[in-house]
Amino acid sequence: MASMLQNGLLAQYYHKDIASNKQAVKEKNLLQELKIKKVIVHSFEGDRSESGGFFCEKKISKNYTLIETYTKSYISGRSILTSSYNENGLLLQSMDSSDMAVSASQYEYDAKGNILKITSRSHSFDDDFATSLTEVHQYRYDEKNRPVQMLRIRNGKDSALIDFLQDEIGNITDEIEPGINGKHFYYYYDDKNRLTDIVKYNAVKGALKPDFIFEYNRQNQLVKMVAIEEGMSGDYNTWQYVYGDEGQRIIEKCFSKENILLGYFEYEYK
């Protein structure tokens, strides 16, 4: 179960850069509101036994501008995730380092708190070779602070423009990368403007298929996420979330396509 801490399917720019950033800030603000200084994550396997060799602890600074998460497991080794926030609660930098790779992202904002630029650098290495990548995302907004375009630059030379379309309310509905190999993502919402589906064209199946499906409770908390793999198998995992009375996530379970429990996390707050 320890290897499933991070969902590797997340790839859509709007979801990854903007929506997930807002969610991270929201979760940090809740920790600050509840005066929580430490979070311990306990990992369990599908048979409900503890995940051997797993350790995960999140430490929060006194002024809530620095959060360090240390994770160790037999499967993925050791890693440290450091997140820095400014006095307004906006994420400034995140750095994730492990025995095999280091990645860091820096965030720049305009006066209204919109993300203007994200600069990400990653470096991975093993006994045979090392690889490095620098990727910059530059966002442009309309007069209502809604993203309309993003310029992606890889290693200072490979660039592409990503266009965003909106509905009449202002929800992002389409993310379009022009070109033969460009992808077109569709975002769907419920009657409360909550994101319910992220869909793209699946070339293998020749049809529009979802990458993610989301469900919420009456408190607008995410209670279920289905992550679908690409390809012919149509395999997917379902994540279910349980929250405490004060809004903090306390349990996170993962099920297979056959509804078999693969493992789960329990969160302890101090």
Task: Name these PLM-found stretches.
Residues L10-K270:
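Buried hydrophobic residues that stabilize the cores of well-folded domains
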Residues A2-L9:
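C-terminal segment of classical bacterial N-terminal signal peptides
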